[in-house]
Amino acid sequence: MIIDTTEVQAINSFSRLESLKEVYGIIWVLIPIFTPVLGITIGVLVIVWLEREISAGIQQRIGPEYAGPLGILQALADGTKLLFKENLLPSRGDTRLFSIGPSIAVISILLSYLVIPFGYRLVLADLSIGVFLWIAISSIAPVGLLMSGYGSNNKYSFLGGLRAAAQSISYEIPLTLCVLSISLLSNSSSTVDIVEAQSKYGFWGWNLWRQPIGFLVFLISSLAECERLPFDLPEAEEELVAGYQTEYSGIKFGLFYVASYLNLLVSSLFVTVLYLGGWNLSIPYIPVPELFDITKRGRVFGTIIGIFITLAKTYLFLFIPIATRWTLPRLRMDQLLNLGWKFLLPISLGNLLLTTSSQLLSL
């Protein structure tokens, strides 16, 4: 059987076409995976740079300025330095718990990004229990911190892990009650539905105005969950050296460093989604869709505008936790627990009862 030249060329072109299809298929699988990872990484780098610049302004000094333009690559330089440092293990500690702890803390926080809507219908997992899934996942992170403290075989590390667990339990309940109030107002636990419920009434329909008490409780509780000053008792330098991070070095210490900023970004994004209208701008007396001509330019342009609005609100809100770090003194452990159990818990419970009563009366 003789095959002429044209048939050989056709077979070769067909095989090349099949190879290209396989390559494109792999690329389309990898794009949804690496795009959120890249976005989250850039978001964390921006937060670190913002914190250093704002902190420098508050303290009247010059922030980072040599690594990249305006020092924006300083966080990347610090991460590279940690990556090449020696990874030390405690001689008498539990090495398995010591190694698993940072990974649990980071993974549990990363999973929270699944239910955050960055734009109209732009969410990785639009679940009917979105906000409560976030609360359930975020409660896993202190387990990793406790494992790290216990596995270090160090009294300072163990005390830091215990403080992290006690602090998380104390402030998780008021946080959950505030989220439950928002869920009752929106008649849904989906993050997308909560944003759309606020969009119906414009700027004055934001839950910030409908739930001012809940917003304050949520703000304080989220600061405590992120272990930011004045609630950074699990890693208080003057008392516990570095808390549960004392024995860590290299990439494992870097994971804790990244986890703290990931948690801060998640909390700010949920404040934006639950209280600040999410991707909806709604400036009073300014018709935003007509201003940007979203309806005529198509859905892609509207999605880009929604992402920009969500991130702008998030980074503007980040000024509050960054400023409180250099403004308020650290609480004592008894003051922290009293604030959570004796003040925030009754206030959040009363807010939930008021919200439930108003919803029942409006039926």
Curated annotation (Swiss-Prot):
Task: State where it is primarily located.
Answer: plastid
In UniProt terms, what function does this protein have? NDH shuttles electrons from NAD(P)H:plastoquinone, via FMN and iron-sulfur (Fe-S) centers, to quinones in the photosynthetic chain and possibly in a chloroplast respiratory chain. The immediate electron acceptor for the enzyme in this species is believed to be plastoquinone. Couples the redox reaction to proton translocation, and thus conserves the redox energy in a proton gradient.
> Looking at its record, which EC class is this enzyme?
translocase
UniProt keyword annotations, A-Z:
Chloroplast, Membrane, NAD, NADP, Plastid, Plastoquinone, Quinone, Thylakoid, Translocase, Transmembrane, Transmembrane helix
- Record-listed E.C. numbers: 7.1.1.-
Q: Where are the transmembrane segments?
A: 26-46, 98-118, 127-147, 253-273, 300-320, 336-356
Q: Does the keyword Thylakoid apply?
A: yes
This protein's name: NAD(P)H-quinone oxidoreductase subunit 1, chloroplastic
Q: Which InterPro entries match?
A: NADH_UbQ_OxRdtase_su1/FPO (IPR001694), NADH_UbQ_OxRdtase_su1_CS (IPR018086)
Instruction: Provide any one GO MF term from the record.
Output: oxidoreductase activity, acting on NAD(P)H, quinone or similar compound as acceptor
- Which domain of life, per UniProt? Eukaryota
Mention one GO biological process in which this protein takes part, according to its record.
Answer: photosynthesis, light reaction
* The reaction(s) this protein catalyses: a plastoquinone + NADH + (n+1) H(+)(in) = a plastoquinol + NAD(+) + n H(+)(out); a plastoquinone + NADPH + (n+1) H(+)(in) = a plastoquinol + NADP(+) + n H(+)(out)
Q: Name one Pfam family in it.
A: NADHdh
**Topology in membrane:** Multi-pass membrane protein
Description of how the protein assembles with itself and partners:
NDH is composed of at least 16 different subunits, 5 of which are encoded in the nucleus.
Q: List the disulfide bonds.
A: none
Q: Name one GO cellular component term.
A: chloroplast thylakoid membrane
Family the entry assigns: Belongs to the complex I subunit 1 family.
- UniProt subcellular location: Plastid, Chloroplast thylakoid membrane
Organism of provenance:
Helianthus annuus
